[in-house]
Amino acid sequence: MGKKAIQFGGGNIGRGFVAEFLHEAGYEVVFIDVVDKIIDALKSTPSYEVTEVSEEGEKTKTITNYRAINSKTNEEDVVKEIGTADVVTCAVGPNVLKFIAPVIAKGIDARTASKPVAVIACENAIGATDTLRGFIEQNTDKDRLSSMSERARFANSAIDRIVPNQPPNAGLNVRIEKFYEWTVEQTPFGEFGHPDIPAIHWVDDLKPYIERKLFTVNTGHATTAYYGHMRGKKMIADALADAEIRQIVHKVLEQTAKLITTKHEITEQEQNEYVDTIVKRMSNPFLEDNVERVGRAPLRKLSRNERFIGPASQLAEKGLPFDALLGSIEMALRFQNVPGDEESAELAKILKEMSAEEATGKLTGLEKHHPLYEPVQNVIAKVQKDSK
């Protein structure tokens, strides 16, 4: 039997990042989704194209050898597939992990193979696989928990690849940047060894990679989007062509760099080179990366361990400067009532109906005694005053 991977989420990242590399590693990919349109398209199309875009031009790869199942209507089939799979991955968004966990729990419980399945969540969130594992354990019989490691091994990952908005007639085809990083911890696999996926960079300690990525790529990307949105820019590359926005982004990333080099064994030179690479990637006009796409879901992006409050809170605890990040937080708070983005409407409602104190707790999860609490509360009060 050939190798088989189950990929939850048939969206752009699922098809254009995860499945591309699983396919190249020789896996049959079984897509799982609840969106009829995506499943029907995958079932009726034997191949699709992934086009990697860079300043050097474009390179197109054809993806084949996949199937698709709708977990909403065919849950038992999904359970059977997980029962005989080598790998389970997902790219569904951190908020959806709790919804896919019950069927994964059933699939893991049904396994009889001697080698455990590798479970790797590919989400923009710290410890996403741990989060998924927690939900899976909640959906597993207590007397089966102690032996679960015989049936599944869970590894956290850090993913990095820009997937812009796709052309309206793209169908299953995905345009994606050429650059990527997919880093996964290898220690959970123990004596079984990690899956054979050449695109993955396997490491013993993932935390430095996750924090460096989240607090550089995601912080920089979102900062560019929110400042760009306030200035009426349509594309990320247009926003970074504005010298003032570019300077602000560099200032923000200087502050997060200080945190990263202080905490982890990453030198200032390594981090500076990483920042330059990231800003260059985001400035790529060929990606046609939309400001509103990058800015969407501001509530999640303003939460406690995310790209702004996460690094700013740690800097505040260390007595290091975080003023540039406060600027990003302010611009994120001003991303309100953007068409097609429910969270931006919810943000506007919270800021309108709550006091600055209530909104600070609700949006950021910061404790009142935290050194970042008062500065953020002041920014929230300022945004509320400007909105009146």
Swiss-Prot record:
One of its GO terms (biological process) is mannitol catabolic process. Monomer. The lineage of its organism: Eukaryota, Fungi, Dikarya, Ascomycota, Pezizomycotina. The active site is at 213. Keywords: NAD, Oxidoreductase. Catalyzes the NAD(H)-dependent interconversion of D-fructose 6-phosphate and D-mannitol 1-phosphate in the mannitol metabolic pathway. Has a strong preference for NADH over NADPH. Its EC number is 1.1.1.17. Transmembrane segments: none annotated. GO terms for cellular component: cytosol. Pfam families: Mannitol_dh, Mannitol_dh_C. This is Mannitol-1-phosphate 5-dehydrogenase. It comes from Aspergillus fumigatus (strain ATCC MYA-4609 / CBS 101355 / FGSC A1100 / Af293) (Neosartorya fumigata). GO terms for molecular function: mannitol-1-phosphate 5-dehydrogenase activity; NAD binding. NAD(+) binds at residues 5-16. It comes from the Eukaryota. Disulfide bonds: none annotated. Belongs to the mannitol dehydrogenase family. It catalyses: D-mannitol 1-phosphate + NAD(+) = beta-D-fructose 6-phosphate + NADH + H(+).
